[in-house]
Amino acid sequence: QGVRSFGMALSPRELGVGEYGGGLLEFPEDALPPGTPLAEAWPEEVVLDLEVTPNRPDALGLLGLARDLHALGYALVEPEAALKAEALPLPFALKVEDPEGAPHFTLGYAFGLRVAPSPLWMQRALFAAGMRPINNVVDVTNYVMLERAQPMHAFDLRFIGEGILVRRARPGERLRTLDGVERTLHPEDLVIAGWRGEESFP
């Protein structure tokens, strides 16, 4: 088009800062002034690749690893929750059909959220852990999951119907995951689904 190019948009994999290569690396709005060197925006850091041998779910997150190190004499600083939650009635129902598979299920809800890119420091942390940042709502659940080894997911209240149902997968049930892949579920898989009337949908 007769316009000289002084740069190129690249994926995290092409830049060597993450494993995701299916799209461009995007920065939050107003996070960096134009022309900022990548070395300043994304400083080099050490990433540890650890194998956790005990079959202890609470030991598989960052906090669990820190507690193990604390047992060896290292200092431990427990993260504090910045948000104080109130115990309020949920605006939807919860059904757990399989209490053996899901003996404890916690729900919370928030209103007035604005979906936007995550802060750069959180994107960097997720990339370092081999995860692809998506947006601030999804990313914070993944970040806390990595920190506390507690599976989490964010749901859009507009699309869950009458409530949330925790059940086993039906024979031959298929589910399209966030990466766009359609997967066939096993009858032993736990499914978190919304429902309307007699119909439930993952």
Predicted features by range, described:
Residues 33-35, 41-43, 118-120, 129, ...:
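Charge-biased, low-complexity intrinsically disordered regions
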Residues 1-82:
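Phosphate-backbone binding interfaces of nucleic-acid-interacting proteins
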Residues 15, 116, 172, 197-199:
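Short loop/turn segments at secondary-structure transitions that flank enzyme active sites
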Residues 1, 54-71, 130-156, 195-202:
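Conserved phosphate/anionic-ligand binding catalytic regions in large, soluble enzymes, centered on
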Residues 2, 39-43, 58-61, 99-103, ...:
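Solvent-exposed alpha-helices and their adjacent loops that cap or buttress functional pockets
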Residues 26-33, 79-89, 193-202:
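Conserved alpha/beta core surface patches that mediate binding of polyanionic ligands
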Residues 177-180, 187-188, 202:
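Short beta-alpha junctions and helix-cap segments that line functional grooves
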Residues 76-174, 181, 192:
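Glycine/proline-enriched, intrinsically flexible loops and inter-domain linkers
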